[in-house]
Amino acid sequence: MITKNELRLYRQLKQEAKELSEQIEELEMTMIVPGCQQITGMPVYHSEDHDKIANVLAKAEQMRKVYFDKVDVLLDLQEKIEVAVAKLEPKERRLIRLYYFAGLTWEEVAVQMDYAWRQTHRLHNICLKKLKMA
């Protein structure tokens, strides 16, 4: 059983997952950059510098784990929704995917499906009823 609220949540979480992915990439870059050698000469590391770099790397790794945990939760919800949506008719699946997964507006969904705006909402209500029963 999938509710409208879960679908809305999925739409929001999908955007959050994209943002988290970008943050993970940034963190991975910070984990690489501190250990780079200076171009002007030999690397000069004092014990204080080494401790600071180690602290930055440890914090970055902690944040990376937090982000991956969040992405894992998002993927669990996505799997649950995908299983339920798979039981819908093709045009219903398309409507759900365009609006909730691709993040299109209702107007854009109507254009993509070559439906009237009102017709997309009728079909959406049918989808929600079927998903609630599933």
Per-segment meaning from a language model:
Residues M1-A84, M133:
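N-terminal interaction/assembly modules
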